[in-house]
Regions:
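Periplasmic-binding protein-like
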Residues: 5-6, 68-74, 171-179
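Active-site rim beta-loop-alpha module in soluble metabolic enzymes
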Residues: 117-178
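Short, flexible loop segments at boundaries between secondary-structure elements
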Residues: 198-217
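N-terminal beta-loop-helix "entrance" segment that forms/cooperates
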Residues: 33-59, 146-151
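Short, well-structured alpha-helical segments in soluble
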Residues: 51-66, 157-171
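N-terminal beta1-alpha1 ligand-phosphate binding loop
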Residues: 3-25
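Short, structured coil segments at secondary-structure junctions
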Residues: 28, 86-89, 105, 134, ...
């Protein structure tokens, strides 16, 4: 099985981190092809970045026609509908994957994301997926996406602080990491706080493996039809 994991921004260091997270959970016989867009924004933070990254994302998908599934490694689920229309293999965004994983193991969950301007888009997605009632809050750390690549201890401190606030005030039962740039923190944070911490990259790879194993592909009747 070959899974294409696409980072829709152009920051290769984030793609490297995403690749490590994907390969850590993939089956031994699964090949992970990790790549990023060649054109577009360096990070995706809010509605404008979401819109401007889609042409580069679609171009990158077209460069990899021989894959069995696609994971779009942006927590906004950028371009998922467009890519599902373009291809027939299963396509999953890491936001949708993480929300569903959290809903399966906890009665309620919170999302820890980057900038405040990203919050409305994530809340819109939760409503669209029918999971808004299970998410008690989407919390912003006000950390720019690219700051996650610097390894600054202050960045990790802010993420941990929001998790503590969520546990105390939101009474959350699980934490969803709301950015692919946080993928490397899942195990560390889960162990420290003693509750499930979900990374969408890991969840996305695991879910698309299951879809391929069950011989399920994107429906071409209705919304994702090109006819």
């Amino acid at each position: 099985m070959k899974i294409l994991v696409i980072n829709p921004n152009t920051t290769s260091s984030m793609t490297d981190k995403i690749a490590i997270a994907a390969r850590a959970v993939a089956r031994p016989d699964t090949e992970i092809v990790a790549t990023n867009s060649q054109d577009g924004p360096a990070s995706i933070q809010g509605f404008l970045d979401v819109a401007t990254c889609i042409p580069g994302l679609l171009a990158e998908v077209s460069r990899h026609p021989d894959v069995d599934a696609i994971v779009i490694a942006c927590f906004d689920d950028t371009g998922v509908d467009a890519v599902r229309t373009l291809v027939s293999v299963p396509v999953l965004g890491i936001g949708e994957a993480a929300y569903h994983a959290a809903s399966m193991i906890a009665n309620k969950f919170s999302v820890i994301t980057t900038l405040s301007r990203s919050v409305p888009g994530l809340e819109n997605n939760l409503m669209r997926y029918g999971l808004a009632q299970k998410c008690v809050r989407v919390r912003a750390t006000d950390i720019p996406v690219l700051k996650l690549e610097e390894g600054d201890p202050a960045t990790l401190f802010k993420i941990k602080s929001e998790i503590r606030e969520s546990i105390v005030h939101d009474k959350t039962e699980a934490i969803v990491l709301g950015c692919a740039g946080m993928a490397d923190l899942m195990a560390q944070l889960s162990e420290e706080f003693g509750l499930p911490v979900i990374d969408g990259v890991a969840a996305g790879v695991t879910f698309v493996e299951a879809l391929v194993n069950n011989r399920l592909s994107t429906s071409k009747i209705g919304a994702y039809s090109r006819n």
